[in-house]
Amino acid sequence: DLPDARPVETPAAKAESLPHNESPDPLGDPIEVDVVIPIAHVATSNTAIAPTAGRGTQVSYVAAPTNPVGSRDELDRPQWESVRTRIQDAVRESIEIEGPIALNRLIRNVVHRFGFDRAAAKRQEVVRQFVPVDLIHEDELGCFVWPSDLDRHAWTGFRTTPSGFVRPLDEIAGEEIINALVHAARNGVYDREQLMRDTLAYFDQSRLTKQSADRLELCITKAERLGKLVRRGVGYVSAT
């Protein structure tokens, strides 16, 4: 596999002028994370219509934006209304453009947009408060955030990874991998390894590493359990 890709770092945006009632706090002050907990409800009600709802089979993957939305000092002050608004907007934008998106990827992306190369635990926790709880789904295949109008049970599409872009398999929702497996087996495949390799090709990956094989094994097992893949001897065929 190719090395993990890191988003191109862009200089952090210059901090905007602060309202008269938002005087700077000392940098050493603790972050009042609890004050942003109610925002999750607001973010849920304001989640816009997601383009993923119309995604079909083999649509090209589009990553969430990485352009700056604020400065480092601002992310350390989530009690400011202007900062809360920008965090909420960045979270919503990522879900709309890239959803389903891995929760940890979503959080890291928003932290990076405030100028940080590394997403420290305390800053991840701040951003986490803004992710709508009802859009998060966690199972044995990972924790992902879904657009509000995309039914993960009914969705049959998947996104192909553009050449040269590294998209780790563990950052792809299990439902999306299963959809790709089903598509790869539409005309039948002669064995399990061929099914895995054909599916990896959709995500611009050629090496079947142990990590990739383990994740694909879980997805194949689940696809069989859901009746989406049918075993024929040592091979597989799509049930749809």
Please place each PLM-identified region on the residue numbering.
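Intrinsically disordered, low-complexity, repeat-rich polar/charged segments
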Residues: 9, 13-15
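C-terminal non-catalytic scaffold/interaction domains in large multidomain proteins
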Residues: 18-240
